[in-house]
Amino acid sequence: MFTVLGRVMNRHCALRAHSRIRMPTPMKVSSLLPLPHNLLRTYATEKHDMDELNKSTDYMHIQNILLQKEKELSTKHTLLKEATGFYDRFKINTKWFLIRGNRPFSFDELSTLFSWLIISQIIWVILGTTTFVSLVLFTFNTVFAKEMVGKFVGNTLNKYIDSCDVEFQDALVPEWKKGCIRFRSVKVRTVTDGKSDVPSDQLQFDLKFNQVDITLSVRKWMTGHGLIDNLTVLGMHGKVVLNDVNENKLVGWFSNPEYHLGAVKVCDSCFTLRDGNQDYRISIYNMDMNRLRFEWCVSDFFNANVVTGAINHSLFTIHKRQHKLAYLQDLEKDLSPWKRITRLRLDRISVKDLGLDKSSSFNWIEEGSVEIIADLMLPNVEDESQDSDEEKNNKYMVMDLKFNFRDLKAKFPESAPTLSNGETVISFDELKPIINYINNRRVIFNSVATTETIDPDWNRITPVSIKRQKSYPDTTVIPTSVTWPDGEDEVQINKEIIKYHDQPTTNTNNLILKCRIVKNIDELQNVALFRESGVYDVLAMELYVDLMKIVEEWEFKKKNSWMRLWGTTLASQLLIFGLGAMV
């Protein structure tokens, strides 16, 4: 303490002594003049003296720094000249860069270096997880056998994935250009063990992947959303089995239902899906998704950029609906609060391939085909921390569906159609008119088609010359003032004089059903299968409502036309009898 006070007093006295002497500047070293020793100075003179003192002090400080740096450089150059090898020169340069000297490191300096090393590694792992793991795998592949590394990674994954067996046949190859880790010839299959509480019987699969590219993220792993960030699958094939062994949802099969994946891409894949007693051959040509969250599987799947594939060789597409008009910025605002409108289209597929004849809701359908077009309006579903007021107000999903059935054939079922919970959708008495309507339409259209396609023998007989005039013309002559009913062609050439009473006006036996379904988006949370949301039951009831309206309208028209025909016939007969009695 006294030492510090002594230094301060000495410096104060030195400054007072220097204030009485005019210090020379660098440019005026030779012109040094003595100052008058007057004791009374003005304020301006004292200020001028202080400026000169500051200049001289800065000059001396700069000179001291330059001398110190020159001494350090000379010491560094001297040490480098005395070094005998690369290790000595590297040691001198490293110490001079870190501590500006050649002395041994102190304990504080070593602890600081160690702390910075740990922090830098943590930052590297967090920001460049994929690169870090790629270097580790590349090092292991170089040092050890590639098969050993594949088995080691497979065994490691099997410890953390319940009821699954992962096997790598080829080596692990880091893809430096794409910034991902590439696995080749990967096999994933489910195994049954009694140690796990997961209902493994609910989902079983045996899949093979030609190539799998993944990127890792420690930040996602620290938040509990899984280590894998982006996933790309090429050449997947195998078999998947879904079993309704209990009432648990499929999302409970995953050990971490909150697993979040980033970009997911699947290309050139084909697998067989067995759902109950029905087999589906599903091909995925291209699937590009921005994200895939296990708790929002259905929502993220329908919000995919594009999904193209086939179900039992019938093409299907999922994409953003294209507008007929120009897509302006104002139109995008009109579409809010929905994220976008997704168009789902499934080309014509047999009802047997789709499994409608085996379903409990439409067990009366025997043959036919169907084409499905659906527009899905899904709201924005973000994380809870990112929810806005607009997203909270809109919590409903709207689906506009159109089913185009063609050439249906119905049968009387053994049991009444029911929903998934066992409730009856429609009774036998209400189902009879529907079956009669569908089968009558099929018979009429098949009869008309047969009549148009068959060329009878009497049409090929050469005409016989008879002088007697025919009692009826070959074609029906219609005056121009007569207008055709709605639905019939305006040009009536070579039409039959005698026709079926209920002959159809179109050439195709199509039955079009439309409906709109509104569903709360919260009901799609923690749902991995679309049928688990209850949409199928609502869809079945809406289709039956529309179908019954069509049948009632057909029965009314048929009854009305018969009554009109009967009344006209009776009136004409009475008129003829009356005229005959008068004559």
Curated annotation (Swiss-Prot):
In the database record, which residues form the transit peptide?
1-43
Mention any one GO cellular component term assigned to this protein in its UniProt record. Answer: mitochondrial inner membrane
Ordered alphabetically, the record's keywords are: Membrane, Mitochondrion, Mitochondrion inner membrane, Transit peptide, Transmembrane, Transmembrane helix
Q: How does it sit in the membrane?
A: Multi-pass membrane protein
Q: Name one GO biological process term.
A: mitochondrion inheritance
Cellular localization per UniProt: Mitochondrion inner membrane
Point out the signal peptide segment.
none
Q: Which PANTHER family match?
A: MITOCHONDRIAL DISTRIBUTION AND MORPHOLOGY PROTEIN 31 (PTHR31068), MITOCHONDRIAL DISTRIBUTION AND MORPHOLOGY PROTEIN 32 (PTHR31068:SF1)
**What is this protein called in UniProt?**
Mitochondrial distribution and morphology protein 32
What organism does the UniProt record list as the source? Kluyveromyces lactis (strain ATCC 8585 / CBS 2359 / DSM 70799 / NBRC 1267 / NRRL Y-1140 / WM37) (Yeast)
